[in-house]
Amino acid sequence: LYAASLRLPFLPTRAGLGSDVMTLQPWLRTVRSPYADEEELLAVPAIELDLAIVHMNRADAKGNAQFLGPDFFFDDLFLGAAKRRFVSCEKLVPTEELTREGSFHTLRIHRGMVDGVVETPRGAHFTECPPDYGRDEAFQSEYANAARDAEAWSSFEGRYLALESEAEYQRAVAARAAGGAR
């Protein structure tokens, strides 16, 4: 992802040399450093993406976005590596509000990296978006179990995915969490 975000065909690394990486991935290549040491390095190819959608805590309408949790998860690299880039966010705010909560270090996404923004509360469900909400482990377990069986998947899809709107999905998830059906 980093190579693609820099628009490079590959990045050299020492990681993997002296291991079975080259044996297990025979399509990988090595390159020699053009400098005096002429060190042999592994050339890891860029992972170019057609589309990236990342979810952030807050964003403005221009595409400047902020994460408030403890880990940034490579979201900037996904956007940098993609041809089309979108941010969904818990809350759409005026630009000046982005500096009112969290340090400037939390503003890792800027408008030049983004093609569009959409406000989508709870848009990272079933994963987390701290401090707004944590992982929904029970829902993730239901999802993983359903994915193992075609009939179970069809039922899961009908309950959660084949709905008319995001609002219906959120109601179904809330009903499930409350122990009821939608």
Residue ranges and their predicted role:
Residues 1-182:
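Conserved alpha/beta enzyme-core scaffold
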